Swiss-Prot record:
Record has Transit peptide as a keyword: no
EC class name: transferase
Stretches of the chain found on the membrane's Cytoplasmic side: 1-6
List of catalytic residues: 319
Lineage of source species: Eukaryota, Metazoa, Chordata, Craniata, Vertebrata
UniProt protein name: N-acetyllactosaminide alpha-1,3-galactosyltransferase
GO process annotations (BP): carbohydrate metabolic process; lipid glycosylation; protein glycosylation
Keywords: Glycoprotein, Glycosyltransferase, Golgi apparatus, Manganese, Membrane, Metal-binding, Signal-anchor, Transferase, Transmembrane, Transmembrane helix
Glycosylation sites: 60, 295
Amino acid sequence: MNVKGRVVLSMLVVSTVIVVFWEYINSPEGSFLWIYHSKNPEVGDSSTQKGWWFPSWFNNRTHSYPEEEAVDEGDEQRKENSEELQLSDWFNPQKRPDVVTVTEWKAPVVWEGTYNKAILENYYARQKITVGLTVFAVGRYIEHYLEEFLISANRYFMVGHKVIFYIMVDDVSKMPLIELGPLRSFKVFEIKPEKRWQDISMMRMKIIGEHIVAHIQHEVDFLFCMDVDQVFQDSFGVETLGQSVAQLQAWWYKADPDEFTYERRKESAAYIPFGEGDFYYHAAIFGGTPTQVLNITQECFKGILQDKKNDIEAEWHDESHLNKYFLLNKPTKILSPEYCWDYHIGLPSDIKIVKISWQTKEYNLVRNNI
């Protein structure tokens, strides 16, 4: 073989090796996890994101963007061709006459006993859905809460369906080493720490919105956003899925709206006057489709920025703005307090099964500006 032939052959061999290696690291069977270093990602600009490959202590598979996009297109076509599930197919409000099960705008309030799990599971299994879950753990919240949250979520959150956990931390070196079950994967993002816990709470709206635009909208069908200082106790399943999902706050679900701790100062964008309001919603859990969650986070952050401009801070920070949002944009589904319960209240007869419970609030240990 002449010199020219050997050169061409060498180039072909090298190209083949590169292609094979690239396909391996991007395949579901690859043994790596992509961890993002994203100090301040700009909306729609992935060039600000930086990352490294890490061994998969965390996970037994990785997410493949090209393959998933192809699957997503097929799923969308199948969903269009499938028969839409009607509320009456799976929801029976008469099963729980002891509680409010339907809102004035005809949205279901999901309590244990009101839904047919078998019908829902069968429907969503055919849809081949992917559900995302965002959680923030900054500072000492990582060591105090993150591991237990993730272990319990791995066990109880959307079991049997594909799940992506989006974990936002300010120090990836403190990320607990957890092995996930089948159909589950992690994406870990390093975010900029804030000086005050109040700012961490409010900035999460901005960060979630940025990540939805950058990639989440292409990766999941539904998205939940949750606080880290809580623990899954039982199945948190597909009965919770909807276009726009709000969570009833455990301490206020029986109270009159005028008793709610809404923001009552007119100067705040979160202002809700006495005489108005439906329920008091808990910012520890909210969700919906990526498009709806994006709208929630953008509108809440817009209100936060308006308050900063007017030198005011809503009483309950992002939660106050979330309640204002849901007053103006009614949620299509509401979760009962069973899905986010505080055992300090006790266990009244209407709470049949606790799905998620609050962790003990150790603010003196985890908040750095008290």
